[in-house]
Amino acid sequence: MYELDKAATLLINGWSGHSSLIDNIVVWCANDLLFLMIALVLMRWWKFLNYLPIRHTALVAGLSFILALAANMVIGLLVHRMRPNDAGLTHALIAHSPDWSFPSDHSAASFAIASALWFQHRKKLAVALVVAAVALGASRVFVGVHYVSDVLGGAIVGLTAAYGVSKSFKENNNLSRRLVRLF
């Protein structure tokens, strides 16, 4: 299985370094696309200040984001996988944090946000954010800081976090109403 992961990672990372335009676009995705996704959710929160269902959706996305990153921190304590560029496998186009590679925090966070919107029946925006999450995950492999399996692992963590929050934090419960009105 490692050989397949390695081959897929090398294939995607092998596309880097051939066009500065493409490299710059992908580097932007790898570094900044997650912030754009967060900004979109926050803008919906403020735009629909008096519409509680949209605010609830934004709250679920935020809680899913936090849960996914917390789960990644725990997994990171248990699974120590060197980043592919640190292992000499890929060439990195960006600097990265000095933590372990698996699972991808960017992937977990972006898929948590996109999946939360999907589970809250905000399908149109969710589809756009799933496309953004896939682009973000692929860009992290392209720039050489993650294996493909790191991104897939992060996507599973994000999806699971969003599912758990969506199922346990319903729109009609008292806690949800209080939190939405509080902020």
PLM segments and residue spans:
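Hydrophobic core of alpha-helical transmembrane segments in multi-pass integral membrane proteins
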Residues: 35-45, 66, 70
